[in-house]
Swiss-Prot record:
Stated name of the protein: ATP synthase subunit a, chloroplastic
Location in or out of the cell: Plastid, Chloroplast thylakoid membrane
Function, as annotated: Key component of the proton channel; it plays a direct role in the translocation of protons across the membrane.
Pfam families: ATP-synt_A
Organism ancestry: Eukaryota, Viridiplantae, Streptophyta, Embryophyta, Tracheophyta
MF GO annotations: proton-transporting ATP synthase activity, rotational mechanism
Keywords: ATP synthesis, CF(0), Chloroplast, Hydrogen ion transport, Ion transport, Membrane, Plastid, Thylakoid, Transmembrane, Transmembrane helix, Transport
SS bond partners: none
Family of the protein in this entry: Belongs to the ATPase A chain family.
PROSITE patterns: ATPASE_A
Gene3D superfamilies recorded: ATP synthase, F0 complex, subunit A
NCBIfam families for the chain: ATP_synt_6_or_A (TIGR01131)
Gene label: atpI
Amino acid sequence: MDIVRSPISTLNHIYEISGVEVGQHFYWQIGGFQVHGQVLLTSWVVIAVLLGSATIAVRDPQTIPTGGQNFVEYILEFFRDLTRTQIGEEEYGPWVPFIGTMFLFIFVSNWSGALLPWGILKLPQGELAAPTNDINTTVALALLTSVAYFYAGLTKKGLGYFGKYIQPTPILLPINILEDFTKPLSLSFRLFGNILADELVVAVLVSLVPLIVPIPVMFLGLFTSGIQALIFATLAAAYIGESMEGHH
């Protein structure tokens, strides 16, 4: 009997692992539209964490920074250097807040999926996860980046900005137009795919071996999440710099 039960229990366990689902959503009906409620909830948590941290960090600024203020100034310096490197010495200033906000939102969103126990909170449908685990979030961030670099180019060059589409030769017009469509696609799918894959791998490993084994993968996921935030922010700054200078 035990010999028969063993394969059956193994099959049941495999069936439970196969229950790890993708694309299950908790919908809110707003007007005539359905929105992903769990994405809004987790995004609000991330925004609250960022606003709360910023408020605490700057509530009592000192002339000689110490502790938390010193750490915040180090982060701001990092954003400034990143933006200046990609956009250029003369134009980078106004774009530091945008690039910094992009990096922080993506970074905290990615880490929230690994560090916060979203699974404790049960929803009627779907489950809570990192905001960047949803393709709608990453597409929105990518489209916001596209709007930013079009705005930067038009502000700097006016209608002459569109002359880049026929450079260095008008034959490349279709390819240059296609490039502007592939930029947001690559930004959104790269971020979404990496975060989703990381959470699925951890979920499967926890189902197979609940102790010890998933821990190194979780640490690797934290590292990957930080790298993805850096890649997104760097590319966003590079696209903005390219739209203003025409050479990157």
